[in-house]
Regions:
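Short, small/polar-rich motifs associated with maturation and membrane association
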Residues: 1-356, 361-370, 378, 413-416, ...
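Short aromatic-centered micro-motifs
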Residues: 50, 79, 186, 571, ...
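Extracellular/periplasmic, surface-exposed regions of secreted and cell-surface proteins
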Residues: 136, 183, 307-310, 345-346, ...
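C-terminal extracellular loops and terminal segments
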Residues: 145-149, 728-737, 777-808, 842-857, ...
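Conserved small-residue
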Residues: 252-294, 731, 748-846
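Short Gly/aromatic-enriched secondary-structure transition segments
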Residues: 267-270, 475-477, 542, 776, ...
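Extracytoplasmic gating/loop element in the C-terminal half of outer-membrane beta-barrel translocons
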Residues: 288, 425, 817-820, 870-934
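Glycine-rich, aromatic-lined ligand/substrate-binding cores of catalytic
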Residues: 846-877
Length: 965
């Protein structure tokens, strides 16, 4: 196996850091300047920025519009505030400067972050969107992705349930792959992070408190993302955190208290209804009737609760001599509505942004740390609470087995029925799953302007991301779950999971930028090198209580390296015609040396129509009109945890496959499938867009059309027996297409110093279709996906050419004249008189066709009021809760136990899992805690498209306070 190795010069880094701190006392001759900032009405402008020109040193005005700042006596001050025209005023050795800001609303000179640099928003040629959390509605956002929900067209964020610290699935313009990851690349302060998280922490964005985020920049099309090459097929989200400014220290304290409760519960039969049903279906002298208890237990009430949570954020920003700094700490205590679930998180961060040598060397240093303690519940209790017999008690007085919790026992022997469902309360109380996670992420970025050529800059970025976790999963002795099948009867177990993940980064690039006024041209050329290494190791050890006798032991270690060369040219002619060309070459250790390298080009053109002479008659009304056209290719190689899919390797077998020898069981190894010719998955994107703004920029927006096609899809396919080490391998086969349009518009109807009203609307349409799936182009070939509970190996979704990914594959239900489904009767689609697999139809998809959002935010002095409406249209959900808990045959199992049914049953005698009766339109209109939908399940927003007792999202009521000093 060929390795790519590189060791960064950490000694050089230490020398640079020493130089920074030794230079803190070196200052230019400085004076203290004070003054006042007012608007054209004579009212003080509160919170206006006052910055020393050419530096990051600055302060903000107080409640009376006053400021005080220290600056070189021959420098200039820049005064700015949202909605007003910025002013640059030379100090000229003055100690008092007061200004009046004129109203402007928005400036098109706003700078947005792109890959390895920044660009003025008006000069961007790609599909780039910026979201600033401080300018959107406030709320109980405990994670960064909460702030992106509904904020920009084409970006869909679906939370994976309501548990504390729940992650979210983020999709930009649909998915570009079937088996490789569809997650966008996330870059935090210049460091691309691993989206897979770590053992004991499902959300990789947990360490970035929402209050610390300055902006999100979302790169959508290939002309914008290709600079990141191999990791950008699914778009890029650049997160920039807040930095310090000069002046006296500014202290911010945010406190939020919230109360959460379940929105509603699944409707099931109560104890009396269940007794009547058993009597009707089996008779009062039946074995089933004899199993009924005397209790009246609402199992969902027993496992759910109302909770109180809190979140506190404290930050201090300012400047010490020539060192701007910002320090923050966050403490979050979030309790889940499912009992025994909680999350306690502590984060800390520090940012230093000094400049040296007459501002030619800019240093940007960021260090973030996190400690999180998660207590996980056994989420099987959610489904158990729906189906468990409501006539049974939580505990049985005097019962020793199962620690007194009700269990299904054989009537004649008293032995535990191993296949019976478990008491849902015991799953929470008699289990313990606790994790401790430590994580640190940081970087130092040095940007140096060459003294011999000021137009040339060198940029070095050294970064790291290290996580360490430990999780203990315990089944207490004599607990009901220890009597379950494949467990040691009554013997407790402790499963200990450890994991270390390490991500190292080195980026270096040169950037040349110059205005050639004599030929009306501006040129920017950038070329660079990137190296990134991912390493992980860990272990899983299972021991038996009380003597910690080993039962299962697995250790592993893996690494992945990426090596890249990249370049970009930006050319502007007459500030009207724009061109961007990007080229990146990537190598990955995930593929063999013959397929290791991939080349990813991109080209974008822009035309500022507003700057044409023929637009001058409307220039006083229209402020921006820009046409964009982009083309590019991006790559994909991220196949989850499969680091070497081209090599024949062995992995540790499962505990159930251990081999007995003497009085012990030994782990076995199993072979992994491999393809020596696996290579890059490539996505080609075309994009055309139009940006506009008018009425002094009070109304602005954009329109985009895109076409994306992914070829050489990395797919997991079956292979003939004997042709490989397993019956399935990852290989390149197939194509996938996404096509859509996006539109957004925002308005500021009212902007004054005291009152601001923002309105925003966006809508996106996406069409997804598989265009190739196998080499033979077999029209009948499909890949079954979407496993469900119930039966053995049942699936309800499929990938097939000509249909969207994750389409539903079900029988078409036949109904009687009253609209009731007829059990076992389906449409004979091929007319052969037999209902079989050939009669199933591919119908609808889990993904929405249309996603919309409308926001309103009003801010008056120190108060704000806002709301957000968002809607998904065209998405469908298979209700597995209903299909698995609504047939009469399920209420009694001859092994000796009962199951409850949901109240909206079908009156089927036997389960009909493959009926499209259970497929529902799950479109919705949501305003935080209020949801309007036709879907009758708990929540229409299910990422997988299969509703199977996911952790319910709570209703949350929030009270918050913000204190600034």
């Amino acid at each position: 196996m060929e390795h790519m190795n590189f060791k960064p010069g950490w000694k050089i880094l230490l020398i640079l850091l020493s130089g920074i701190f030794l230079s803190l006392d070196i200052q230019a001759q400085r004076i203290k300047v004070h003054g006042n900032v007012k608007d054209s009405y004579g009212e003080p402008v509160v919170g206006a920025n006052v910055i020393v020109k050419g530096t990051t040193s600055g302060t903000v005005t107080d409640i009376d519009g006053n400021y005080q700042i220290e600056a070189p006596k021959d420098s200039s001050l820049i005064f700015s505030f949202v909605g007003y025209i910025s002013q640059s005023i030379p100090i000229k050795n003055r100690t008092e400067i007061s200004v009046i800001l004129e109203e402007d609303v928005i400036t098109l000179g706003e700078v947005v972050a792109i890959g390895y640099g920044t660009v003025k928003k008006s000069d961007a040629t790609g599909a780039v969107t910026q979201v600033k959390p401080d300018e959107i509605n406030k709320g109980m956002a405990t994670s960064a992705q909460d702030l992106l929900v509904g904020q920009t067209p084409g970006v869909v964020v679906t939370l994976t349930g309501g548990k504390p610290e729940a992650g979210g699935e983020i999709r930009i313009r649909g998915g570009s792959s079937l088996n490789a990851t569809n997650d966008p690349l996330i870059v935090i302060d210049g460091v691309p992070v691993d989206n897979s998280g770590v053992t004991g922490m499902s959300n990789p964005l947990s360490m970035i408190p929402p209050d610390n985020i300055e902006s999100f920049t979302i790169l959508k099309d290939a002309s914008a993302t290709a600079i990141y090459g191999s990791r950008a097929s699914n778009g890029v989200i650049i997160i920039t955190t807040k930095k310090g400014m000069s002046g006296k220290p500014q202290i911010n304290f945010n406190a939020n208290m919230s109360v959460s409760t379940s929105r509603r519960t699944t409707g099931v039969l109560n104890a009396d209804e269940f007794r009547r049903l058993i009597a009707e279906q089996t008779g009062t002298s039946s074995q089933a009737y004899q199993l009924l208890g005397n209790a009246n237990t609402n199992w969902q009430d027993e496992v759910l609760r109302t909770t109180v949570s809190s979140d506190y954020n404290l930050s201090v920003g300012g400047q010490y001599k020539i060192l701007p700094y910002r320090v923050s700490a966050t403490f979050t205590n979030q309790n889940g509505i499912l009992k025994t679930s909680s999350m306690n998180r502590t984060t800390a961060s520090i940012s230093l942004t000094p400049k040296f040598f007459n501002n030619t060397l800019s240093v940007n240093m960021n260090v973030k740390g996190l400690y999180i303690r998660n207590e996980f519940p056994d989420e099987a209790a959610i489904g158990g609470a729906v189906s468990f017999d409501p006539t049974q008690p939580v505990k049985v007085p005097g019962q020793e087995i199962g620690n007194g919790y009700f269990m299904w026992l054989q009537q004649n022997t008293g032995a535990v029925i191993g296949i019976a469902p478990l008491n849902p309360v015991s799953l929470l109380d008699d289990r313990s799953m606790i994790s401790h996670v430590y994580r640190s992420l940081g970087n130092i970025q040095l940007d140096y302007i060459m003294p011999f050529l000021p137009e040339l800059r060198a940029n070095l970025n050294l970064g790291y991301d290290v996580s360490k976790s430990r999780q203990w999963n315990k089944m207490f002795p004599n607990s009901p779950i220890t009597y379950k099948e494949n467990k040691k009867l009554g013997i407790g177990q402790t499963e200990t999971l450890k994991q270390l993940k390490r991500n190292q980064l080195l980026d270096f690039y040169l950037n040349y930028s110059n205005d050639f006024r004599q030929i009306y041209s501006k040129v920017e050329v950038m070329a660079g090198y990137s190296w990134q290494k991912f390493y992980k190791d860990g272990s899983t050890i299972t021991t038996l209580m009380p003597d910690n006798e080993p039962w299962y032991d697995k250790t592993y270690a893996d690494h992945l390296q990426l090596l890249s060369f990249f370049g970009r040219i930006n050319y502007t002619f007459k500030d009207t015609y724009l061109l961007t060309f990007t080229l990146r070459g990537d190598a990955t250790s995930r593929f063999s040396k013959d397929h290791r390298w991939g080349t990813f080009p991109a080209l974008a053109l822009g035309w500022k129509i507003i700057n044409e002479p023929f637009m001058q008659p409307v220039a006083n009304v229209m402020n921006e009109l820009k046409l964009r056209l982009g083309y590019g290719i991006t790559g994909q190689q991220d196949i989850s945890d499969n680091y070497f899919p081209y090599m024949p390797l062995y992995s540790m077998g499962f505990p159930t496959a251990s081999y007995p020898f003497g009085d012990r069981y030994y782990n076995t190894l199993r072979p992994n499938g491999y393809d020596p010719n696996i290579k890059w998955e490539e996505t080609t994107t075309w994009n055309i867009g139009l940006d506009f703004a008018f009425l002094d920029n009070r109304i602005s927006g954009s329109f985009d059309y895109y076409y994306r096609e992914t070829n050489d899809l990395i797919s997991r396919i079956p292979v003939p027996a004997g042709s490989n080490l397993t019956n399935e391998i990852y290989t390149n086969i197939g194509s996938l297409r996404n096509e859509g349009v996006e539109f957004s518009i925002s308005s500021k109807p009212i902007v004054t110093n005291k009152f601001i009203w923002d309105l925003g609307f966006n809508i996106a349409y996406n069409s997804n279709k598989i265009t190739k799936l196998n080499k033979s182009n077999d029209a009948d070939y499909y890949i079954p996906v979407g496993g469900i509970s119930g039966g053995t190996g049942n699936t309800v979704q499929a990938h097939k050419v000509g249909y969207p990914a994750f389409s539903y594959l079900l029988y078409e239900q036949v109904y009687d004249k009253d609209g009731n489904p007829i059990e076992g009767l389906y449409v004979d689609r091929n007319g052969d008189g037999v209902i079989d697999e050939a009669d199933k139809r591919l119908y609808k998809s889990r993904d929405p066709k249309v996603v919309m959002s409308f926001t309103s935010r009003m801010e008056y002095k120190n108060f704000d009021f806002g709301f957000s409406l968002r809607a998904n249209l065209g998405n469908y959900v298979y209700d597995n809760v209903q299909s698995n808990n609504s047939s009469y045959s399920a209420i009694y199992n001859s092994a000796g136990y009962l199951n409850n049914l949901i109240s909206r049953g079908t009156k089927f005698q036997n389960p009909q899992y493959m009926s499209d009766y259970y497929l529902h339109n799950a479109g919705f209109l949501r305003c935080d805690n209020i949801v309007i939908t036709k879907y009758k399940g708990l929540d229409p927003e299910v990422f997988s498209g299969i509703d199977n007792n996911v952790y319910p999202r709570p209703v949350t009521f929030l009270l918050g306070v913000i204190i600034t000093y």
